[in-house]
Curated annotation (Swiss-Prot):
Native species: Azotobacter vinelandii
Any Pfam family: HSP20
Entry protein name: 16 kDa heat shock protein B
PANTHER family: PTHR47062, SMALL HEAT SHOCK PROTEIN IBPA
Gene: ibpB
InterPro entries on file: A-crystallin/Hsp20_dom, ACD_IbpA/B, HSP20-like_chaperone
Disulfide bonds: none
Membership in a protein family: Belongs to the small heat shock protein (HSP20) family.
Residue ranges of every copy of the sHSP domain listed in the record: 29-141
CDD domains, per database record: ACD_IbpA-B_like
Gene3D superfamilies: 2.60.40.790
Length: 147
């Protein structure tokens, strides 16, 4: 009997510590969902960062949105062909893309920055405090009751 890791299937949710627990579920686009390449980093106990290789894109070409617990990052290069230019080899990909990441509860996007061709999206986990247990006195017995 061979062991099978589910970790690669759950690569696109952010918020837990281990890969099997780290990811709630994956959102897969088309077969080309590995473009552009990206990293998911953990910084301390409560901070995460998604770094997306966005070489050749400007801030105006990128869109970052969070809706219903899904972080969506899309990019589309505007046509900017110079007249008289013929590409002998065009190896720099400038195609449109869309990546989606399901955020688990209590993960918030704190900001995004494009620097040196890398789009960094900062995430933080904000876990609400647990309510303190309440004690009540029974009118008949005069002793505390736990709720």
């Amino acid at each position: 009997m061979s062991a099978f890791s589910m970790a690669p299937l759950f690569r696109q949710s952010i918020g837990f510590d281990r890969f099997n627990d780290l990811f709630e579920s994956a959102l897969r686009n088309e077969a080309g969902s590995t473009y552009p390449p990206y990293n998911i980093e953990k910084h301390g106990d409560e901070r995460y960062r998604i770094v997306i290789a966005a070489a050749g894109f400007q801030e105006s070409d990128l869109d970052v949105q969070v809706e219903r617990g899904v972080l969506s990052v899309s990019g589309g290069k505007r046509e900017n062909r110079s007249e008289g230019v013929t590409y002998l080899h065009q190896g720099i990909a400038q195609r449109a893309f869309k990546l989606s990441f399901r955020l688990v509860d209590h993960i918030e996007v704190k900001g995004a920055e494009l620097r040196n061709g890398l789009l960094s999206i900062e995430l933080v986990r904000i876990v609400p405090e647990r309510p303190a247990p309440s004690a009540f006195r029974s009118a008949a017995a005069g002793r505390p009751l736990e709720s």
